[in-house]
Amino acid sequence: MEIKKLEAMIEAILFTMGEAVEVERIASALDHDVDTIRKIIHNMMDRYEGDERGIKIIELDNSFQMCTKAQMYEAIVKIAHVPKKHILTDVLLESLSIIAYKQPITKQQIESIRGVKSDHAVNKLVEYNLVCEVGRMDAPGRPILFGTTEDFLRNFGIASLEDLPVVAPEKVADFKMEAEEEVQLQLDI
């Protein structure tokens, strides 16, 4: 099958699905190997970025999705309803970062790290579809394990969890020292 026809079929699949589609599913549907399909999609991504187009293809954790470019927002909101923006407070961001880096994780583990109840924060993150239930811990009570979603990756502009920034070791040491000083101050009071 020629490349142009494969590109057209990939484009049709991504457009029609409207959500991220695993590269394996695309390859299977087109009776081609995954590496070839991935290369074709990456070439398409480069062309979409280079052309004056309103859409692009993004990669999300071994899946691909067609979406509009951010620069097109002004034109889109004139015709569509303005999407509700979710506000991520410091509490939500703190909880989300704990989940992102420590997943899968239970509410109790989040609360242990934060030092305060986190029910509201986790529930809001689930409501915003940034976090979801990924399973149950094999422990008494079988607590829910939480992890991030594709929407998390999409909203933060990262392709996979491996792309999360790594905290420099010297920063970790600084944070640890600050925490120890804070604990010591509380003990002195």
Curated annotation (Swiss-Prot):
InterPro entries (UniProt xref): ScpB_csome_segregation, WH-like_DNA-bd_sf, WH_DNA-bd_sf
Keyword Cell division: yes
Pfam families hit by this protein: SMC_ScpB
GO biological process: cell division; chromosome separation; DNA replication
GO cellular component, one term: cytoplasm
Keyword rRNA processing: no
Subcellular localization, as worded in the UniProt entry: Cytoplasm
Keywords: Cell cycle, Cell division, Chromosome partition, Cytoplasm
Domain of life: Bacteria
Function: Participates in chromosomal partition during cell division. May act via the formation of a condensin-like complex containing Smc and ScpA that pull DNA away from mid-cell into both cell halves.
Family to which the UniProt record says this protein belongs: Belongs to the ScpB family.
Subunit structure: Homodimer. Homodimerization may be required to stabilize the binding of ScpA to the Smc head domains. Component of a cohesin-like complex composed of ScpA, ScpB and the Smc homodimer, in which ScpA and ScpB bind to the head domain of Smc. The presence of the three proteins is required for the association of the complex with DNA.
Protein known as: Segregation and condensation protein B
